[in-house]
C-alpha cells in the first residue's frame, strides 16, 4: 500500500483584509473546500519546520520554489540546489537550523543524489496535460460561449466599425454567457493589421474591401478557450475571390490537421506542424505561389500549428511538442498565412493576413472540436456577416 497525506500551507483569514478584498479560504477552508488532510499557516518558520521534518523521512523530493526575478531563466538553479538553499541557509554550524544533526545528515544524503530530486512543475504538467471528462465539459462550455460571441461579431461587422467596437461585442457576449473574463488580450486585426500575428491595438476602422482576423476566447471556471476566425468586412458580407481562395486553402489545412489529432494515429504537435507545412505548401503552389526553400515558415507561416490548452492559454509548457497525442489532451490547431506586399508573391494575395483556429480534445479514434459553435465554412461566415442568418 502507498499512504500519502496532503498538508496545505495557507494564509490565515484576516478580517481587516477581508473587509477590502472579500472572504478568503483560510485554514478551515483548506480542509473543508479543498480536502486537505492538514492545514497550517503559511508562516515561513512553520513551513520550514514541517518541510524539514518531512524531508528527513523521504526518498524522493518533488519541489519547485519561487525563482528570484533577478536570476536569468537560463541560469536558474535546479530543484536540488534550490531546496538545499531553502532548508539550509548559510549558518555558522551548517546544521543549526535543524533540531538534530541526524536530520541535517539525512537532508544532505537526499540532496547529494540528483536522482532523488525532481521538478514538481513537470510532474504536475504531465497530470494536467490529460483532461478529465468534467474538465472537457467546462472547456466545451467556454468554447461554446466564445463561439456564440464570435458569431455576434460577424453579425456586427460593417465598413466603418472600429476594431475596438467589435472587441466590445465579443467581450459582452462572453460575459452574458457566464464567462469570468477573457483568457488573453484579444486580436481584432482588420486589413493590413492582420499581417501582425499579435496585433492588439484594435484601434482601426474596418474597410469595405478587407477581412478581419479575430483571435479571442473567454475563460470559464478557470479554463481557457482560444478561437480564431477570419471574416469579410465588406458591406455585403462576402469575401472577394482572392480572399476566399486563400481562406479556403487555410480551412482545408485546418481540417486536414484536425483529422490527424487522434491518439491512435501516433501524431505529436511536432508531427502535426510538419504536416501543416506540407499541406500549406501544396495549397499555395496551387494558387500560383513560387516558394523557395524556407519561405513558407520564415515569412508566410512563421508560427507553430498550435499549443496545449487548459487552465493556462499556453498550458503545460514543460510537455514537449514531440509528445504523442493521448486521449484527454486538448490542443489548438491554427494554421495562418501572412502575405506581405512583396513582388515575390502573387499580386492578388499581397497584404492579406488570415488565420483560422479551433480547440480540439483528443480521443482514441476521433476528437471533439470544442470551438465548433464558431462558424468557419465560407457559406456560413458570409451568411452571418451578410445578415442572412
What are these regions (language model features)?
Residues 1-389:
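Active-site neighborhoods and metal-handling regions in enzymes and metal-associated proteins
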Amino acid at each position: 500500500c502507498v499512504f500519502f497525506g496532503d498538508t496545505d500551507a495557507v494564509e490565515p483569514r484576516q478580517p481587516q483584509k477581508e473587509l477590502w478584498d472579500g472572504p478568503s479560504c483560510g485554514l478551515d477552508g483548506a480542509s473543508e473546500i479543498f480536502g486537505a488532510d492538514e492545514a497550517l499557516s503559511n508562516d515561513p518558520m512553520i513551513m520550514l519546520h514541517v518541510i524539514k521534518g518531512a524531508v528527513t523521512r523521504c526518498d524522493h523530493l518533488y519541489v519547485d520554489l519561487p525563482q528570484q526575478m533577478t536570476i536569468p531563466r537560463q541560469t536558474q538553479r535546479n530543484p536540488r540546489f534550490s531546496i538545499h538553499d531553502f532548508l539550509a541557509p548559510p549558518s555558522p554550524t551548517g546544521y543549526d537550523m535543524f533540531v538534530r544533526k541526524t536530520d541535517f545528515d539525512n537532508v544532505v544524503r537526499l540532496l547529494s543524489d540528483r536522482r532523488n530530486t525532481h521538478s514538481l512543475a513537470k510532474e504536475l504538467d504531465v497530470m494536467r496535460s490529460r483532461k478529465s471528462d468534467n474538465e472537457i465539459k467546462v472547456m466545451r462550455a467556454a468554447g461554446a460561449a466564445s463561439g456564440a460571441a464570435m458569431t455576434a461579431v460577424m453579425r456586427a461587422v460593417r465598413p466603418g466599425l472600429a476594431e475596438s467596437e467589435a472587441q466590445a461585442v465579443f467581450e459582452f457576449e462572453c460575459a452574458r454567457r457566464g464567462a469570468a473574463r477573457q483568457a488573453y488580450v484579444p486580436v481584432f486585426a482588420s486589413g493590413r493589421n492582420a499581417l501582425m500575428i499579435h496585433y492588439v491595438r484594435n484601434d482601426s476602422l474596418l474597410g469595405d474591401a478587407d477581412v478581419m482576423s479575430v483571435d479571442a476566447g473567454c475563460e470559464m471556471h478557470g479554463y481557457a478557450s482560444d478561437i480564431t476566425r477570419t471574416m469579410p468586412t465588406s458591406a455585403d458580407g462576402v469575401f472577394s475571390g482572392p480572399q476566399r481562395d486563400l481562406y479556403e486553402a487555410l480551412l482545408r489545412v485546418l481540417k486536414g490537421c484536425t483529422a490527424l489529432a487522434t491518439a491512435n494515429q501516433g501524431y505529436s504537435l511536432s508531427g502535426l506542424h510538419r504536416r501543416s507545412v506540407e499541406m500549406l505548401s501544396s495549397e499555395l503552389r496551387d494558387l500560383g505561389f513560387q516558394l523557395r526553400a524556407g519561405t513558407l515558415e520564415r515569412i508566410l507561416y512563421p508560427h507553430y500549428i498550435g499549443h496545449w490548452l487548459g487552465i493556462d492559454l499556453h498550458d503545460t509548457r514543460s510537455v514537449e511538442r514531440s509528445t504523442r497525442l493521448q486521449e484527454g489532451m486538448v490542443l489548438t490547431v491554427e494554421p495562418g498565412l501572412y502575405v506581405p506586399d512583396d513582388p515575390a508573391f502573387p499580386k492578388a494575395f499581397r497584404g492579406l493576413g488570415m488565420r483560422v483556429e479551433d480547440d480540439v480534445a483528443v480521443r482514441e479514434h476521433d476528437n471533439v472540436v470544442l470551438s465548433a459553435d464558431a462558424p468557419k465554412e465560407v457559406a456560413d461566415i458570409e451568411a452571418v456577416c451578410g445578415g442572412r442568418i
